[in-house]
Amino acid sequence: MEWINEKAKTLKQGAIRAMFDRANTMTGVISLGIGEPDMPTPKLVCEAAKEALDKGITHYTPNAGTLSFRQAIAEKSYLKDLHYDPKTEIIITNGGMGALSLLFLVLLNKGDEILIQDPQWLNYVAQVAYCDGTAVRVPTDLEHNFEMQPETIEKLITPHTKALMINTPNNPTGSVMTRETMAKIAELAVKHDLLVISDDVYNTLLYAGEEAPCIASFPGMKERTVIVNSFSKSYAMTGWRIGFVAAPAEIVDRMTKCQENFNACANAPGQYAATVALDHPELCEELRQTFERRRSILLDGLAKIDGIRCNRPNGAFYVFADISSFGLSSVEFCNRLLDEQKVVCIPGSAFGECGEGFIRIAYTCSDDNLYEALNRISYFCKKLIK
């Protein structure tokens, strides 16, 4: 008898994990591949979790999460001016990925289409396919700062299109959608009666005075927007698996029922600690300042390397660098860089067809490691040119 179902057989190891597996067999490797803060969770947040344990906050919470946490998100986060009802319009999830998986489970019927940027974080496409949906790629390019163009989006809308996904600041490109573009996309969503899924996980990591407006704040959009976020990037809490969704009550209700049947709730001490974290926005600012400094180090270093071209991304902690001048595919470039110089970068092709010819570089390591990695990349590129 065959034990594994056909859907599960379609899931493959991503290129990111494959690179890490190779790197783990080596010594002296510097990783510019990992998409998470390298620093530990702030001590204040850890102490709050310890306090939760000491208080016996170790049991199931309501399926939608503790009301106190949902109220804190509604009143103290960037959503406060949108007046979400914490009782009916917010759900706490097992990280942002848990939020997306619940959402797609309750949203998609077979054949439903979701428009997704290319290049884009690879898990979106896998989750949509697993839930019987179809991911329709919206091509972007370096010349337009990897920003989806409204006219391109509109050409891809069909009678089967149910939703559009946006992620700003963006993984893998670090680009930030302008207010003007977002306004046009909002108009398209209203015109074509589309749901917009806004993955805001990097929205505290903005540089050079950049702003990241929330699409739910545009006219006619709150009632057709699902906001997905987590504490992973903003508070260096990737391992805690604390995320949330703010959305119309009907969607949150169905997600809550789905969560009840699949995983009950997010962990109780983590919810308690994240509630405390919301009282300390300075923790986000400290992380942001660290990454802004590293961004400058990386961009200044890359600018000195012949053959590499990139924009100046104003968000997240990634640079998406064009390496096409070297005549190697993005996979070949990254494999050789790892083998010859022991530096991990991620092939742009892992994020879609439009990522070919690029590599994703994450500045999620110490300043010293970043300088050393730049020296190694520079040496590697000089050898390729000779």
Language-model segments: what does each one mean?
Residues 64-65:
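Short beta-strand to alpha-helix junction loop
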Residues 69-70:
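Class I S-adenosyl-L-methionine
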Residues 2-6, 10-11, 20-26, 30, ...:
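PLP-dependent class I/II
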Residues 56-60:
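A short acidic, glycine-rich active-site loop
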